[in-house]
Structures are given as structure tokens and as C-alpha cells.
Amino acid sequence: MTTETKEQKKKMIIEHLTWDDSVNADNIKVTIEDGTAELWGSVQNYTAKMAAERDAYQVEGVRKVKNHLDIQFPPTMSLPGDGEIEAHLEKLINWNRELHAGHIHVECDQNVVTLSGTAESFWEKHVILHLANATNGVIEVNDQLRVKPPRVLNDEIIANDIREAFRRNYLIDEHQINVEVHHGSVHLRGTVPGFLVKIEANTIATYTSGVTDVVDDMTIAQ
């Protein structure tokens, strides 16, 4: 990628971030190298942080995004205290009937939440982390959760289940993605045609029985 092309891509990403009404792009710096865009600076909440990453992926030629954005709430915003955040998040987790929340511990210190304990599936862990990140007043989540499925499945069974789900999905060409599983941890590699396929493959792996972790090393084709 030439210097001129890099500057064009950078300009397009910044324009797309500025266009997105859910993102305050005033404090975002963008760098791009070899198709990898990096986002630096701060945004106003977790939703904006995830939206900024999605926006960068939508620009043609961006193959990977590294999201280094911090969350800085507006100075005029009234934030809940650590105890309020803990109590609110514990209620959210305990009231969700899909979650086996008996072994989850929540601690908050200076708006940084630490989650510890065990979840019965990786998708449950994924939901819990999303709830924590989206909670008002939380600037960071320290993930110490472990996944301990009630029934341990053979790695090859897990890998085959994921591959079969890929075959059934009209967005995914299963030949483009290499699936490796080691002690329940799924590693996805390969080059896919777009961001939607990347998200879809991650979602399938996340919701597959027996999975304890998902590592995404997929890149997007130029």
C-alpha cells in the first residue's frame, strides 16, 4: 500500500467515523499499515468503541482493526459509584434466566469491573462480558472468567460441529476458514471476503457446545 493510498484509506475511515452519529470522533486518531487499521484515543462509551471498530472494518481495503480506544465519560455526566455498579451488574446477571450465574463474582474499583469465577459455556461468558462493558459508569472490564462446561467434548467433535455449521451458513465458504481446537479453545484462521463473514464465523464458534475460548486470526481479503 503506497503512502498516498494509506492516506486515502485513513481519510475514508475518519470520514466514516465522523459520519456515524453514535461515535464522537473528535478524540480518535487513526493509523493504517498493510491493511491493518489501528484506532487510538478515546470515545464516550462502550457502544461507541464497538461502533468505531465496525466503521473501520466497513472501509474497503481494511483487513484487520486493532481497537486501542479508551472510554472517557463526559465531565458533566453523573456516574454511579462502585457499589452501585456492582449491585446493578449482579442483578443483570442473576435476572438473566439463560445464565448460570451462581459462580460469578463481580467487583468494581474506580469504575473498573473485575469478573471472576466460572461460566458453563463460552457464549455465557460472552454475554456476561457484554453486560459488564455496557453498564453505565464502567470504563474497563478485567476478565478473569473461566469456562467450565458441564460436559467436556472431544476437540475433533467441536471442530466438526463448527465446520458443519459453516457449511449450512449461506454467508460462509467453509474452505476459506481453518478451524483448530485444543482443549476446547477454538482458533480461526484464514482470509474471508468481508467483515460480516468474520462476525458470522465468530458467532458460530462462540455458540458451539463445548467451546471454552475463541481466538480470531481471520483477515479480510483485499
Task: Indicate where each model-derived feature is located.
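N-terminal targeting leaders
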Residues: 1-222
